[in-house]
Protein backbone atom coordinates (compact mmCIF):
# COMPACT_ATOMS: atom_id res chain seq x y z
CA UNK A 1 0.00 0.00 0.00
CA UNK A 2 2.77 2.47 0.90
CA UNK A 3 4.67 1.62 -2.30
CA UNK A 4 1.60 2.35 -4.44
CA UNK A 5 1.02 5.69 -2.73
CA UNK A 6 4.69 6.62 -3.17
CA UNK A 7 4.51 5.73 -6.87
CA UNK A 8 1.50 7.99 -7.38
CA UNK A 9 3.26 10.89 -5.66
CA UNK A 10 6.37 10.31 -7.77
CA UNK A 11 4.30 10.33 -10.98
CA UNK A 12 2.68 13.60 -9.90
CA UNK A 13 6.09 15.20 -9.33
CA UNK A 14 7.32 14.05 -12.74
CA UNK A 15 4.32 15.72 -14.38
CA UNK A 16 5.06 18.96 -12.54
CA UNK A 17 8.84 18.76 -13.17
CA UNK A 18 9.58 17.23 -16.64
CA UNK A 19 13.28 16.43 -16.95
CA UNK A 20 13.94 17.85 -13.53
CA UNK A 21 14.88 21.26 -15.11
CA UNK A 22 12.40 23.38 -13.18
CA UNK A 23 13.47 24.55 -9.73
CA UNK A 24 11.39 23.28 -6.86
CA UNK A 25 9.53 26.00 -5.05
CA UNK A 26 10.28 26.14 -1.37
CA UNK A 27 6.79 27.42 -0.66
CA UNK A 28 4.19 24.71 -0.12
CA UNK A 29 1.13 25.06 -2.28
CA UNK A 30 -2.07 24.86 -0.32
CA UNK A 31 -5.21 23.55 -1.98
CA UNK A 32 -8.25 25.78 -1.61
CA UNK A 33 -10.58 24.72 1.16
CA UNK A 34 -13.18 22.23 -0.02
CA UNK A 35 -11.10 21.01 -2.99
CA UNK A 36 -8.69 18.08 -3.34
CA UNK A 37 -5.63 17.76 -5.52
CA UNK A 38 -5.46 15.13 -8.28
CA UNK A 39 -3.02 13.10 -6.20
CA UNK A 40 -5.34 13.13 -3.18
CA UNK A 41 -8.27 12.01 -5.34
CA UNK A 42 -6.22 9.15 -6.76
CA UNK A 43 -5.18 8.07 -3.27
CA UNK A 44 -8.80 8.09 -2.07
CA UNK A 45 -9.89 5.99 -5.05
CA UNK A 46 -7.02 3.57 -4.41
CA UNK A 47 -7.88 3.24 -0.72
CA UNK A 48 -11.55 2.56 -1.49
CA UNK A 49 -10.57 -0.20 -3.95
CA UNK A 50 -8.24 -1.80 -1.41
CA UNK A 51 -11.02 -1.83 1.20
CA UNK A 52 -13.43 -3.41 -1.27
CA UNK A 53 -10.97 -6.09 -2.37
CA UNK A 54 -9.42 -6.81 1.01
CA UNK A 55 -12.51 -6.76 3.18
CA UNK A 56 -13.56 -10.06 4.73
CA UNK A 57 -16.73 -11.51 3.21
CA UNK A 58 -19.55 -12.12 5.61
CA UNK A 59 -20.94 -15.60 6.30
CA UNK A 60 -23.97 -14.74 4.22
CA UNK A 61 -21.73 -13.98 1.24
CA UNK A 62 -19.68 -17.14 1.61
CA UNK A 63 -22.36 -19.59 2.65
CA UNK A 64 -21.56 -22.88 4.41
CA UNK A 65 -18.51 -24.59 3.00
CA UNK A 66 -18.72 -28.27 1.99
CA UNK A 67 -17.03 -30.22 4.79
CA UNK A 68 -18.20 -33.82 4.36
CA UNK A 69 -16.18 -36.07 2.08
CA UNK A 70 -18.38 -38.60 0.32
CA UNK A 71 -18.66 -40.37 -3.00
CA UNK A 72 -20.86 -40.54 -6.07
CA UNK A 73 -21.49 -44.21 -6.73
CA UNK A 74 -23.68 -46.94 -8.17
CA UNK A 75 -24.97 -49.58 -5.77
CA UNK A 76 -24.84 -53.00 -7.39
CA UNK A 77 -26.80 -55.70 -5.58
CA UNK A 78 -25.57 -59.27 -5.53
CA UNK A 79 -28.93 -60.27 -7.03
CA UNK A 80 -27.71 -58.75 -10.31
CA UNK A 81 -29.38 -55.32 -10.19
CA UNK A 82 -28.34 -51.71 -9.77
CA UNK A 83 -30.36 -49.75 -7.25
CA UNK A 84 -32.39 -47.07 -9.03
CA UNK A 85 -34.49 -44.10 -7.83
CA UNK A 86 -37.20 -43.17 -10.32
CA UNK A 87 -38.74 -39.70 -10.90
CA UNK A 88 -42.15 -40.94 -9.66
CA UNK A 89 -40.62 -41.71 -6.25
CA UNK A 90 -40.39 -45.47 -6.70
CA UNK A 91 -37.22 -47.40 -5.91
CA UNK A 92 -36.26 -50.60 -7.68
CA UNK A 93 -33.42 -52.58 -9.18
CA UNK A 94 -32.43 -52.44 -12.82
CA UNK A 95 -29.98 -54.60 -14.79
CA UNK A 96 -28.98 -51.55 -16.86
CA UNK A 97 -25.99 -49.56 -15.64
CA UNK A 98 -26.25 -46.63 -18.09
CA UNK A 99 -29.09 -44.71 -16.42
CA UNK A 100 -28.19 -41.61 -14.40
CA UNK A 101 -31.00 -42.58 -12.00
CA UNK A 102 -28.65 -45.27 -10.64
CA UNK A 103 -26.19 -42.62 -9.43
CA UNK A 104 -26.24 -41.92 -5.70
CA UNK A 105 -24.43 -39.62 -3.30
CA UNK A 106 -23.17 -41.48 -0.25
CA UNK A 107 -22.79 -38.75 2.37
CA UNK A 108 -21.35 -39.50 5.84
CA UNK A 109 -23.65 -38.20 8.58
CA UNK A 110 -22.16 -40.03 11.56
CA UNK A 111 -19.71 -42.73 12.59
CA UNK A 112 -20.20 -45.46 9.95
CA UNK A 113 -23.57 -43.87 9.15
CA UNK A 114 -24.45 -42.53 5.69
CA UNK A 115 -27.37 -41.06 3.84
CA UNK A 116 -28.12 -42.28 0.31
CA UNK A 117 -29.19 -39.42 -1.94
CA UNK A 118 -30.20 -39.65 -5.59
CA UNK A 119 -27.62 -37.65 -7.52
CA UNK A 120 -30.19 -37.01 -10.25
CA UNK A 121 -33.27 -36.14 -8.21
CA UNK A 122 -31.83 -34.91 -4.92
CA UNK A 123 -34.22 -37.09 -2.88
CA UNK A 124 -33.05 -39.26 0.00
CA UNK A 125 -33.64 -42.96 0.45
CA UNK A 126 -35.51 -43.68 3.68
CA UNK A 127 -36.98 -46.61 5.60
CA UNK A 128 -40.11 -46.14 7.70
CA UNK A 129 -41.28 -47.86 10.88
CA UNK A 130 -42.84 -50.69 8.86
CA UNK A 131 -39.58 -51.47 7.08
CA UNK A 132 -40.80 -50.03 3.77
CA UNK A 133 -38.32 -48.15 1.59
CA UNK A 134 -39.39 -44.78 0.18
CA UNK A 135 -37.99 -41.62 -1.39
CA UNK A 136 -37.96 -38.50 0.80
CA UNK A 137 -37.49 -34.92 -0.48
CA UNK A 138 -36.06 -33.99 2.94
CA UNK A 139 -33.32 -35.48 5.09
CA UNK A 140 -34.84 -37.03 8.22
CA UNK A 141 -33.78 -39.59 10.82
CA UNK A 142 -35.34 -42.28 8.59
CA UNK A 143 -32.76 -41.40 5.90
CA UNK A 144 -29.81 -42.58 7.99
CA UNK A 145 -28.28 -46.00 7.28
CA UNK A 146 -25.54 -47.86 9.08
CA UNK A 147 -22.90 -48.99 6.61
CA UNK A 148 -20.90 -52.12 7.36
CA UNK A 149 -18.69 -54.47 5.38
CA UNK A 150 -19.74 -58.11 5.51
CA UNK A 151 -17.25 -60.99 5.70
CA UNK A 152 -17.38 -61.51 1.92
CA UNK A 153 -16.55 -57.80 1.33
CA UNK A 154 -20.06 -56.89 0.28
CA UNK A 155 -21.53 -53.80 1.96
CA UNK A 156 -24.73 -53.85 4.03
CA UNK A 157 -27.00 -50.86 4.68
CA UNK A 158 -29.21 -51.09 7.77
CA UNK A 159 -31.71 -48.57 9.09
CA UNK A 160 -30.08 -46.51 11.85
CA UNK A 161 -33.48 -45.82 13.41
CA UNK A 162 -35.44 -49.07 13.33
CA UNK A 163 -34.79 -52.74 14.13
CA UNK A 164 -36.63 -55.78 15.47
CA UNK A 165 -37.92 -54.91 18.94
CA UNK A 166 -37.48 -58.30 20.56
CA UNK A 167 -34.39 -59.69 18.90
CA UNK A 168 -32.70 -56.40 18.04
CA UNK A 169 -32.00 -57.68 14.52
CA UNK A 170 -31.23 -54.92 12.04
CA UNK A 171 -33.47 -53.98 9.13
CA UNK A 172 -31.52 -54.00 5.87
CA UNK A 173 -31.86 -52.45 2.46
CA UNK A 174 -32.45 -55.28 -0.01
CA UNK A 175 -33.65 -56.35 -3.47
CA UNK A 176 -35.34 -59.63 -4.31
CA UNK A 177 -34.58 -61.84 -7.34
CA UNK A 178 -36.93 -59.73 -9.49
CA UNK A 179 -35.22 -56.48 -8.57
CA UNK A 180 -38.02 -55.30 -6.27
CA UNK A 181 -37.28 -53.60 -2.96
CA UNK A 182 -37.95 -55.74 0.11
CA UNK A 183 -39.24 -54.82 3.55
CA UNK A 184 -36.26 -54.24 5.78
CA UNK A 185 -37.47 -56.64 8.47
CA UNK A 186 -37.49 -59.49 5.93
CA UNK A 187 -33.95 -59.01 4.65
CA UNK A 188 -31.26 -61.15 6.26
CA UNK A 189 -27.66 -60.01 6.25
CA UNK A 190 -26.43 -63.44 5.15
CA UNK A 191 -28.54 -63.39 1.96
CA UNK A 192 -27.62 -61.95 -1.45
CA UNK A 193 -30.57 -59.53 -1.25
CA UNK A 194 -28.70 -57.39 1.29
CA UNK A 195 -25.26 -57.50 -0.33
CA UNK A 196 -24.19 -54.44 -2.30
CA UNK A 197 -21.03 -53.37 -4.10
CA UNK A 198 -20.54 -49.58 -4.31
CA UNK A 199 -19.03 -48.81 -7.72
CA UNK A 200 -17.18 -45.53 -7.30
CA UNK A 201 -17.76 -42.79 -9.88
CA UNK A 202 -16.06 -39.89 -8.12
CA UNK A 203 -15.12 -38.45 -4.72
CA UNK A 204 -17.00 -35.28 -3.77
CA UNK A 205 -17.39 -32.79 -0.92
CA UNK A 206 -20.84 -32.18 0.54
CA UNK A 207 -22.53 -29.79 2.92
CA UNK A 208 -24.14 -31.35 5.96
CA UNK A 209 -27.83 -31.95 5.13
CA UNK A 210 -30.39 -30.12 7.26
CA UNK A 211 -32.28 -32.52 9.51
CA UNK A 212 -36.08 -32.41 9.23
CA UNK A 213 -38.65 -34.08 11.45
CA UNK A 214 -39.94 -37.49 10.47
CA UNK A 215 -43.48 -37.09 9.04
CA UNK A 216 -46.26 -38.57 11.16
CA UNK A 217 -47.15 -40.90 8.31
CA UNK A 218 -44.07 -41.92 6.36
CA UNK A 219 -44.94 -42.68 2.74
CA UNK A 220 -43.94 -46.00 1.28
CA UNK A 221 -42.29 -46.36 -2.09
CA UNK A 222 -44.78 -46.49 -5.00
CA UNK A 223 -44.77 -49.83 -6.77
CA UNK A 224 -42.15 -50.09 -9.51
CA UNK A 225 -43.45 -50.33 -13.04
Curated annotation (Swiss-Prot):
One Gene Ontology term of the molecular function aspect: growth factor activity
Signal peptide coordinates: none
Primary localization class, coarse: nucleus
Region (Disordered): 1-28
Domain of life: Eukaryota
Tissue-level expression: Brain and eye, and in a segmental pattern of the embryonic body wall. In adult olfactory bulb, hippocampus and most concentrated in Purkinje cell layer of the cerebellum.
Pfam families xref list: FGF
SMART domains from the UniProt entry: FGF (SM00442)
Keywords on record: Growth factor, Nucleus
Localization annotation: Nucleus
InterPro entries linked: Fibroblast_GF_fam (IPR002209), IL1/FGF (IPR008996)
Similarity comment: Belongs to the heparin-binding growth factors family.
Job of this protein: Probably involved in nervous system development and function.
Listed name of the protein: Fibroblast growth factor 11
Gene name, Swiss-Prot/TrEMBL: Fgf11
